[in-house]
Swiss-Prot record:
Keyword Transcription: no
Source organism: Burkholderia cenocepacia (strain ATCC BAA-245 / DSM 16553 / LMG 16656 / NCTC 13227 / J2315 / CF5610)
Pathway(s) this gene product operates in, as recorded in its UniProt entry: Metabolic intermediate biosynthesis; 1-deoxy-D-xylulose 5-phosphate biosynthesis; 1-deoxy-D-xylulose 5-phosphate from D-glyceraldehyde 3-phosphate and pyruvate: step 1/1
Top enzyme class: transferase
Protein name per UniProt: 1-deoxy-D-xylulose-5-phosphate synthase
Length: 634
């Protein structure tokens, strides 16, 4: 099994194969990807669709001297397998294992780290120009999906690249969402080879030089050329950016891919190759339902993904989806917006029931936020469902287009905190810090499912921009209450009171997901716990009351410490004039790797045991007190 694949330890081994061996290799590689992902979980459909393209790129180009940048990066499992990581695939997305995305520190073949979309063309262009300036002769290749091409950044890069006439740059559009079959067969294959050949490029340049003295004739020639292409391929705007457009070609046909790429390798200037692939290629269940098999957990490939037979706790994403439908049913002004995350954000049912008020704007976070602001000016109630990590991409719009004008937009921020297997690129670590400094913002953090529902309802009633953050995955098991209750603005609640004597009283001010582990720590230490609820405006009165009645104050949040919720509490204490020792707990000042979320939180000291340990070591350890006193005396 995998007889050919076992011989490939790097692309140099691949390039030694005979062309006739490549399709059998592709079959083995596809089977290996399916087997690996079924055991570890991960992205499947997209990787099954890029097998032949990956083989062709490494076969034709001299990687790693030639650079390949994979947009988004979740389709790079075949690339990882062919570049020396075949025997590490069992650790994919596991703690201390290899990443599910390209990572420069992991391999020299991962030339640029990706995970967010639409960055590849900019990076590849920078590499191409950098190589020129350094006097290096190498190709830079960006592989980008049709979804990622909807983002403005991709077109900004195209616009810049088109004027770089000598750059050895290739942009490959991996089009896996075409509604019609790609043109295939001898004629299309011949056209792709012709359009990528040196004769075509040279002839075209020569004709343009000759006809430049007669602009009307040149324009006619251009129109005739475009019309000739249009008879066989889709009309293209890419040549308007200065690219030579080639395709579309079948991205699963190595006999088409390889000669086309070989021709392109001999050209200079920006080239654009349009390949058509199929998500889930070669695995019928994934072909039939690529969304279901986009990012599955472990499963049996022979049986496919089976519905769980054990009752599961409701996820926060489900809580949001149900809330949005309930609010839309009550109020026709409610509008739902998502930047290409319908399933991930829990908006499938909303789209079905309220299609005229559902807007999937594509991978366009900046547009989504400003679009919501425009809706708000017309008296509508826009709700932007967005992952914490992707809201970062629309920071200027959040400030300039929404908060500055104090527009009532609700931000439902999913995947707040650590996200597990996707790792640092997708962690929602920064939203509290980057939103808290924005005037007019109200920010809430949910501690359980029902509180999340009521916070979302509260947010919808506010006359200003309001954010509710909640984590990925299942909640605590708390039932949601159908009736809505508006939470008093800026008010937290005490969930547990200490019975400790003076001198040992600890108050834990917990935010969102950290309420439950803080309560666990408090049981061990006999501490007071407050569910702060609001990060902005923080409950300054509650902060002062607890500081005045306790000896030590601890803040706990699942976000970066610097500038976060704990900082809000410290600022409130300073404003009140109450001086108390404060311990701020949260995510450390580093990018936290992928792994099991519970294990990662434990590693960060943010489970019950870790919180108790930190408090004990800082405030309640007699040995530490004695050492501290001795140090002060000295």
């Amino acid at each position: 099994m995998y007889d050919l694949l076992k011989t490939i330890d790097d692309p140099a081994d691949l390039r030694r194969l005979d062309r006739r061996q490549l399709q059998p290799l592709a079959d083995e590689l596809r089977a290996f990807v399916l087997d690996s992902v079924s055991k570890t979980g991960g992205h499947l459909s997209s990787n099954l669709g890029t097998v032949e393209l990956t083989i062709a790129l490494h076969y034709v180009f001299n990687t790693p001297n030639d650079r390949i940048v994979w947009d988004v990066g979740h389709q790079t499992y075949p690339h990882k397998i062919l570049t020396g990581r075949r025997d590490q695939m069992h650790s994919l997305r596991q703690y201390d294992g290899i990443s599910g995305f390209p990572r420069r520190s992991e391999s020299e073949y991962d030339t640029f780290g990706t995970a967010h979309s639409s960055t590849s063309i900019s990076a590849a262009l920078g590499m191409a120009i950098g190589s020129q300036l350094n006097g290096d002769d190498r190709f830079s290749i960006a592989v980008i999906g049709d979804g990622a091409m909807t983002a403005g950044m991709a077109f900004e890069a195209m616009n810049n690249a088109g004027v770089s006439e000598d750059a050895k740059l290739l942009v490959i559009l991996n089009d896996n969402d075409m509604s019609i079959s790609p043109p295939v067969g001898a004629l299309n294959r011949h056209l792709a080879r012709l359009m990528s050949g040196r004769f075509y490029a040279a002839a075209r340049a020569g004709v343009e030089r000759v006809l430049s003295v007669a602009p009307p004739v040149l324009e006619l020639a251009r129109k005739l050329e475009e019309h000739a292409k249009g008879m066989v391929v889709p009309a293209t705007l890419f040549e308007e950016f200065g690219f030579n457009y080639i395709g579309p070609i079948d991205g699963h046909d190595l006999d088409s891919l390889i000669p086309t790429l070989q021709n392109i390798r001999e050209l200079r200037g920006p080239q654009f190759l349009h390949v058509v692939t199929k998500k889930g290629q070669g695995y019928k269940l994934a072909e039939a339902d690529p969304v279901l098999y986009h990012g599955p957990g472990k499963f049996n490939p022979a049986e496919g993904i089976k519905p769980s037979t054990t009752p599961a706790k409701k996820t926060y994403t489900q809580v949001f989806g149900e809330w949005l439908c309930d609010e839309a049913e009550r109020d026709t002004r409610v509008v739902g917006i998502t930047p290409a995350m319908r399933e991930g954000s829990g908006m499938v049912e909303f789209e079905k029931r309220f299609k005229d008020r559902y807007y999937d704007v594509g991978i366009a976070e900046q547009h989504a936020v400003t679009f919501a602001g425009g809706l708000a000016t017309e008296g509508l109630k826009p709700v932007v469902a967005i992952y914490s990590t992707f809201l970062q991409r629309a920071y200027d719009q959040l400030i300039h287009d929404v908060a500055l004008q104090n527009l009532p937009v609700v931000f439902a921020i999913d995947r707040a905190g650590l996200v597990g297997a996707d790792g640092a690129t997708h962690a929602g670590a920064y939203d509290l810090a980057f939103m808290r400094c924005i005037p007019n913002m109200t920010i809430m953090a949910a501690s359980d499912e029902n509180e999340c529902r009521q916070m979302l309802h509260t947010a919808l009633q506010q006359p200003n921009p309001t954010a509710v953050r909640y984590p990925r995955g299942a909640g605590t098991g708390v039932a949601t209450v159908k009736e809505f209750t508006e939470i008093p603005l800026g008010k937290g609640e005490v969930r547990r009171r200490t019975s400790q004597p003076e001198g040992k009283r600890v108050a834990i001010l917990a935010f969102g997901t950290m309420v439950a582990p803080s309560l666990a720590a408090a049981e061990e230490l006999d501490a007071t716990v407050a569910n702060m609820r609001f990060v902005k405006p923080v409950d300054a009165a509650l902060v002062r009351e607890l500081a005045e009645t306790h000896d030590y104050v601890v803040t706990v949040e699942e976000g970066c410490v610097m500038g976060g919720a704990g900082s809000a509490c410290v600022e409130a204490l300073m404003e009140s004039g109450v001086i108390r020792p404060v311990l701020q707990l949260g995510l450390p000042d580093l990018f936290i790797d992928h792994g099991d979320p519970a294990k990662l939180l434990s590693q960060c000291g943010l489970d019950g045991a870790g919180i108790a340990k930190s408090i004990r070591e800082r405030f309640l350890n007699p040995a530490a007190d004695v050492a501290g006193q001795a140090k002060r005396v000295a």
